[in-house]
Amino acid sequence: MKQKFIFVTGGVVSSIGKGLTAASLGALLEGRGHKVTIMKFDPYLNVDPGTMSPLQHGEVYVTEDGAETDLDLGHYERFTSALMNRSNSVSTGQIYDTVLNRERRGDYLGGTVQVIPHITEEIKARIYEAAQGSEIILVEIGGTVGDIESQPFLEAIRQMRIDVGQENSVLVHVTYVPYIAAAGELKSKPTQHSVKELREIGLQPDFLVCRSEKVIDDNLKAKIGLFCSVKPENVIAAQDSRFIYEVPLALHREKLDELIVARLGLSAGKLNMKGWQNLVKILGNPSHTVKIGVVGKYVDLKESYKSLHEALVHGGVANNARVEIIYVDSEKVTDKTVHSLLGKVDGILVPGGFGTRGVEGKITAIKYAREKRVPFFGICFGMQLSAIEFARNVCGIKDATSREFHAENKRTGNFVIDSMAEQRGVINKGGTMRLGAFPCAIASGSRAYQVYKASSIMERHRHRFEFNNKYKDLFEKNGMMASGICKERDLVEIVELPDHPWFVGVQFHPEFKSKPLAPHPLFVHFVKASLKKK
């Protein structure tokens, strides 16, 4: 059987939900027994999002093989069993970088290098590469139809649909149908114009997924279908859901998966979505509520912590609880304000981050959690700061710090957190950190061992700095245990306080491996401990 290609585009506005649509459709096709993968094209000129501000781009999602990617890849992995890698996330910057390097080497034999065919051929080559080993590949095109940046990708899709045959490809266009309160009705004109933009470049959508606040009835579907040359049954209503994990079930109710399977000549299989149904049931009617305070510096944009947010939700579901996440700006946390900001939460989490802004506020929050015996979870930078707090306030090293905070001077001192040897002298920032999955050996009898129920694990990393081993004996003497070690490099990956209700810091990012139907055990146990504190 030939591979099948499902292209997902978006119109009218950005952030319309293309990624969730692709991920949800992937979940439905998997539920019917098909092997899927999903890839994302981002139209920006950055090579990857690794050096972009989270406040502009949202979180950087790290894959097993160490690629720094768009947060939509997190949706793809959470909604399906597919494992993403660097071939699943491609930017305009990567495409141009590859083509221009070939030109410099003389690979084009003196020919004029142009968007068509050179850029479009490279785009198609990336799709074929990502599709290897899968039966179906869903390809999300970032941006909005009509944007200049997206045009080469749309042209490549037009060519591919001819190359692979219309019977082996489907174009799903996600659009927006706004509700005009003054008129009391939904308006289809923006969708019509968005499809018109697609048709002008030779693309006719097979399916329209219409986002809306209100119910789209059959009459409006028929109207949209008529003006957009789409069968009315292929106009899919996608009303706003309470939870993102309702989206696969909502699309199934509209028969999107059935229609696409039939359109591509695939086996319908027997759909099994019981896990998703149970998940939504718990989310809609939990037995408990728990408050978790997340102390960070990127709180103005919640998507900066997207995977973290979802992992906490997963941990709540495993405990039949709704997790109320309270985001706290670390710059506002001081000795005077910490109790008013965190006094009513049941657990405190300090996530990853970079730089000095807001550091002392995070350290104050960690001290509060340790002294008040509030369940605490430190991730990456949060783990490093928990070590600094412990060094200052328990071990008596008042000038304990991280070399990251003094990178531009030659200060010597108590660098409890120090740069790894291979990071010293690194000039380029992009793609040069310790990235991807690495092994960690867990000490028997530790809380980490109780959580994982395993002596060896693999977790994903994104950092330049590590715990300084010359302080390890002093820390353990004063009560902080190094319970997880990367033995290949003798790097401390997990620290914990055995005499605290729940105080764990990890150098890696467990949120990247949490799924709604398979919550990460660290988040399950953190939420469980927070419920006990409540």
Curated annotation (Swiss-Prot):
Disulfide bonds: none annotated. UTP binds at S14, K187, S188, K189, P190, T191, Q192, K223. Residues 1-266 are annotated as: Amidoligase domain. The active site is at C380 (nucleophile), H509, E511. This is CTP synthase. GO terms for biological process: 'de novo' CTP biosynthetic process; pyrimidine nucleobase biosynthetic process. GO terms for molecular function: ATP binding; CTP synthase activity; glutaminase activity; identical protein binding; metal ion binding. Mg(2+) binds at D72, E140. Pfam families: CTP_synth_N, GATase. CTP binds at S14, D147, I148, E149, K187, S188, K189, P190, T191, Q192, K223. Pathway: Pyrimidine metabolism; CTP biosynthesis via de novo pathway; CTP from UDP: step 2/2. CTPSs have evolved a hybrid strategy for distinguishing between UTP and CTP. The overlapping regions of the product feedback inhibitory and substrate sites recognize a common feature in both compounds, the triphosphate moiety. To differentiate isosteric substrate and product pyrimidine rings, an additional pocket far from the expected kinase/ligase catalytic site, specifically recognizes the cytosine and ribose portions of the product inhibitor. It catalyses: UTP + L-glutamine + ATP + H2O = CTP + L-glutamate + ADP + phosphate + 2 H(+); L-glutamine + H2O = L-glutamate + NH4(+); UTP + NH4(+) + ATP = CTP + ADP + phosphate + 2 H(+). It is an enzyme of class 6 (ligase). Gene3D superfamilies: 3.40.50.880, P-loop containing nucleotide triphosphate hydrolases (3.40.50.300). InterPro entries: Class_I_gatase-like (IPR029062), CTP_synthase (IPR004468), CTP_synthase_N (IPR017456), GATASE (IPR017926), GATase1_CTP_Synthase (IPR033828), P-loop_NTPase (IPR027417). One of its GO terms (cellular component) is cytosol. Homotetramer. ATP binds at S15, I16, G17, K18, G19, L20, D72. Its EC number is 6.3.4.2. Belongs to the CTP synthase family. Residues 291-534 form the Glutamine amidotransferase type-1 domain. Keywords: ATP-binding, Glutamine amidotransferase, Ligase, Magnesium, Metal-binding, Nucleotide-binding, Pyrimidine biosynthesis. The lineage of its organism: Bacteria, Pseudomonadati, Bdellovibrionota, Bdellovibrionia, Bdellovibrionales. L-glutamine binds at G353, F381, G382, M383, Q384, E404, R464. The gene is pyrG. Allosterically activated by GTP, when glutamine is the substrate; GTP has no effect on the reaction when ammonia is the substrate. The allosteric effector GTP functions by stabilizing the protein conformation that binds the tetrahedral intermediate(s) formed during glutamine hydrolysis. Inhibited by the product CTP, via allosteric rather than competitive inhibition.
